[in-house]
Curated annotation (Swiss-Prot):
One of its GO terms (biological process) is isopentenyl diphosphate biosynthetic process, methylerythritol 4-phosphate pathway involved in terpenoid biosynthetic process. Pathway: Isoprenoid biosynthesis; isopentenyl diphosphate biosynthesis via DXP pathway; isopentenyl diphosphate from 1-deoxy-D-xylulose 5-phosphate: step 1/6. Mn(2+) binds at residues 151, 153, 222. It is an enzyme of class 1 (oxidoreductase). InterPro entries: DXP_reductoisomerase, DXP_reductoisomerase_C, DXP_reductoisomerase_N, DXPR_C, DXPR_C_sf, NAD(P)-bd_dom_sf. 1-deoxy-D-xylulose 5-phosphate binds at residues 128, 152-153, 177, 200, 213, 218-219, 222. The gene is dxr. NADPH binds at residues 21-24, 47, 50, 127, 129, 206. One of its GO terms (molecular function) is manganese ion binding. PANTHER family: 1-DEOXY-D-XYLULOSE 5-PHOSPHATE REDUCTOISOMERASE (PTHR30525), 1-DEOXY-D-XYLULOSE 5-PHOSPHATE REDUCTOISOMERASE, CHLOROPLASTIC (PTHR30525:SF0). Catalyzes the NADPH-dependent rearrangement and reduction of 1-deoxy-D-xylulose-5-phosphate (DXP) to 2-C-methyl-D-erythritol 4-phosphate (MEP). HAMAP family: DXP_reductoisom. This is 1-deoxy-D-xylulose 5-phosphate reductoisomerase. Belongs to the DXR family.
């Protein structure tokens, strides 16, 4: 992975933080504040739901170059130069930055991702959905090495891949904690509540990422992301369960050796590495204490109980807009679950239903989406189809779930 960014004349890297009020964004600002000799904030962007947090960030950083997607929140904040549905994209286009951290949630991050790549800035990508949805569009817009992953698994893979040449790679191994329901059977999952799905055993994340981790949809998205970022075919990417979340991923080489990246679960490490790539940031996180007795476990993923990863693999192998459809169907189904309209297993069942009906979005002559509108049209169709599936799944299930939770 090459490094197209050398920094501007002042020596510090200018960082534009998209999704600054979320879990990744707030931790990134802490990393930047702790390393004023390495980084400076040149802009902030947020949806507007956590306005108090954004106002505190504005005061702490002194940054006035801010975008808020919600017009009402922007009006309440006052003196916001960019607001409205296209505010974040305009902020990216008009801000001189060395690094754009995209920590937005969901496929709405696609246009800002493309805008960041077009500016030539390094893209520190936490918004995996934009890569999953945009696929070949995003890759075509990127210079070699311009996209640096923030996800701990892909950050780990990028580090491990330094240990060999591309033709020496046998397979990638993505690790998964297994989520809060590891070891449960399919029947147990029927009674899972949003509160239970909102607690992760090892990571502290935002609501949607935590839910996606519980359903293993997040690992499905990461499988697609690994294929796109590193160009390794799907049949050479494995997913294994590692409950301790210390080994973040591994690369096995053709000579039988495996290189792993290990560290206690702390997102500040991959965040800092993405901001400073290829240089590391000293003291970003604590290291493993190897003199203290510990056990690291690895086990196969139960794909019968948690089929989300294999659905993602299937969508990725088909190509076209199928990965965008996987992502959009999940967003609708996950929201329906959080609202108590469907049961937990219906999230992945909805994705499967939508993919099964999506033949029209399969690739024509091996082609991917040609434009952003192609992606958005596919996702619009997927959301509509998902809502139909949710309505069907809701029959007889919502009342049972409400009774269980009352």
């Amino acid at each position: 992975m090459n490094n197209p960014i050398e920094g501007h004349a002042g020596g510090r890297l200018r960082v534009l933080v998209l999704g600054s009020t979320g879990s990744i964004g707030t931790q990134a600002l802490e990393v930047i504040a702790a390393n004023p000799d390495r980084f400076e904030v040149v802009g902030l962007a947020a949806g507007g739901a956590q306005l108090d947090t954004l106002l505190r960030q504005r005061a702490a950083t002194g940054v006035t170059n801010i975008a808020i997607a919600d017009d009402r929140a922007a009006q309440l904040a006052g003196d916001i130069p960019y607001h409205g549905t296209d505010a974040v994209t305009r902020l990216v286009e008009e801000t001189e930055a060395d690094v754009v951290l995209n920590a937005l949630v969901g496929a709405l991050g696609l246009r800002p991702t493309l805008a960041a790549l077009h500016t030539g800035a390094r893209l520190a990508l936490a918004n995996k959905e934009s890569l999953v949805a945009g696929g070949s569009l995003v890759l075509a817009a990127a210079q070699p090495g311009q996209i640096v992953p923030v996800d701990s698994e892909h950050s780990a893979l990028a580090q491990c891949l330094r240990g060999g040449t591309p033709d020496e790679v046998a397979k990638l191994v993505l690790t998964a904690s297994g989520g809060p329901f590891r070891g449960w059977n399919a029947g147990d999952l029927e009674r899972v509540t949003p509160e239970q799905a909102g607690v992760h055993p090892t990571w502290s994340m935002g609501t949607m990422n935590t839910l996606n981790s519980a359903s293993l949809v997040n690992k499905g998205l990461e499988l697609i992301e690994a294929n796109l970022l590193f160009g390794i075919p799907y049949d050479r990417i494995e997913v294994v369960v590692h409950p301790q979340s210390i080994v973040h991923s591994m690369v096995t080489f053709i000579d039988g050796s495996t290189i792993a990246q290990a560290s206690p679960p702390d997102m500040k490490l991959p965040i800092s590495l993405a901001l400073g790539w290829p240089q590391r940031v000293g003291g970003a996180a604590r290291a493993c204490a190897f003199t203290t007795a510990s056990t690291w476990e690895f086990e196969p993923l139960d794909i019968d109980v948690f089929p989300a990863v294999e659905l993602a693999r299937h969508a990725g192998q088909i190509g076209g807009c199928m990965t965008a459809i996987y992502d959009a169907a999940n967003e609708e189904a996950a929201e329906a679950f959080l609202q108590g309209r469907i049961g937990f297993p219906a999230i992945v069942a909805t994705i499967a239903d939508v993919l099964q009906r999506a033949d029209q979005w399969a690739p024509q002559w091996g082609e991917g989406p040609a434009t952003v509108d192609d992606v958005l049209d596919a996702q619009r169709w997927a959301r509509e189809r998902a809502l139909c599936a949710v309505a069907t799944a809701s029959s007889g299930k919502v009342s049972d779930m409400v009774l269980e939770r009352s």
